[in-house]
């Protein structure tokens, strides 16, 4: 009998404890709060909407032939079908993401590809392990913000896109660049832009990881030039075109 009373007392104590700390629902409480409010209430307070999963996106990195450039792949489209180069902080006024990446100490240039972002550091002494956490956070925060990647469109350089005024040779050069050469260069985190053809010389602009790559001349001569000459006999050579700021930097580094 005593054991039964103790068991009953323990059961009553458990029920009271549950009502006190677990807030067991009763008909009285349902009148105050409908059942759907209990069902929809999350177990933990949410800091962001459930649909905002991009904050936890998985970003992959890929090495490039340039040891100072690293390719960041966010797993979603960046510019989809085109590329955009930001060689200096001044050029980043068109993109909120590029501006934020330049605020990271040690970042020299930024390049957007169809589905990747190439970041180039200032020198080989900088450790990627120190830069990558800030770059990861900047990319994730930007995609979570929903802001547009580019706020001001810029027209392509003259002669880059195909034109009805192009002669047969120029049209073949542009088609070969777009179908065979540029996709390969973009896999290495860069791009090559057509700037002109005169007296048998194709003038090209290297971007992204190719800009300061030690093997950029080999890429031009052994890769691009050989392919163009193989398919287009009128091509006698390839020449690299540099912007004024790139030429000044190259002269400063060589002096």
UniProtKB/Swiss-Prot annotation:
Signal peptide: none annotated. Coiled coil: none annotated. It is found in: Mitochondrion; Cytoplasm, Cytosol. [4Fe-4S] cluster binds at residues 210, 213. It holds the Pfam family NifU. GO terms for biological process: iron-sulfur cluster assembly. Residues 173-241 are annotated as: NifU. It comes from the Eukaryota. One of its GO terms (cellular component) is mitochondrion. Iron-sulfur cluster scaffold protein which can assemble [4Fe-4S] clusters and deliver them to target proteins. Belongs to the NifU family. Monomer and homohexamer; the apo-NFU1 is a monomer, while the holo-NFU1 is a hexamer composed of a trimer of dimer that is probably linked by some 4Fe-4S cluster. Interacts with HIRA and EPM2A/laforin. Interacts with BOLA3. Interacts with HSPA9. This is NFU1 iron-sulfur cluster scaffold homolog, mitochondrial. The gene is Nfu1.
């Amino acid at each position: 009998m005593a054991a039964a009373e103790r068991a009953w007392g323990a059961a009553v104590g458990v029920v009271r404890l549950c009502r006190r700390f677990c807030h067991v629902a009763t008909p009285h409480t349902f009148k105050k709060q409908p059942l759907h409010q209990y069902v929809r209430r999350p177990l933990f307070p949410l800091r962001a909407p459930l649909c905002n999963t991009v904050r936890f996106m998985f970003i992959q990195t890929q090495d490039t032939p340039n040891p100072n450039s690293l390719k960041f792949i966010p797993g979603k489209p960046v510019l989809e079908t085109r590329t955009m180069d930001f060689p200096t902080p001044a050029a980043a006024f068109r993109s909120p993401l590029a501006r934020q990446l330049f605020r990271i100490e040690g970042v020299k240039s930024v390049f957007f590809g169809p589905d990747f972002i190439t970041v180039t550091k200032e020198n080989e002494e900088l450790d990627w392990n120190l830069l990558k956490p800030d770059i990861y956070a900047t990319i994730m925060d930007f995609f979570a913000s929903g802001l547009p990647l580019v706020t001001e469109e810029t027209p392509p350089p003259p002669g880059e896109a195909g034109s009805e005024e192009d002669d047969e040779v120029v049209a073949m050069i542009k088609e070969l660049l777009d179908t065979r050469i540029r996709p390969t260069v973009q896999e290495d985190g860069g791009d090559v832009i057509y700037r002109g053809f005169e007296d048998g010389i194709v003038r090209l602009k290297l971007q992204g990881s190719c800009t300061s790559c030690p093997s950029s001349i080999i890429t031009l001569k052994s890769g691009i030039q050989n392919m163009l000459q193989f398919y287009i006999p009128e091509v006698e050579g390839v020449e690299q075109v540099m912007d004024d700021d790139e030429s000044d930097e190259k002269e400063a580094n060589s002096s």
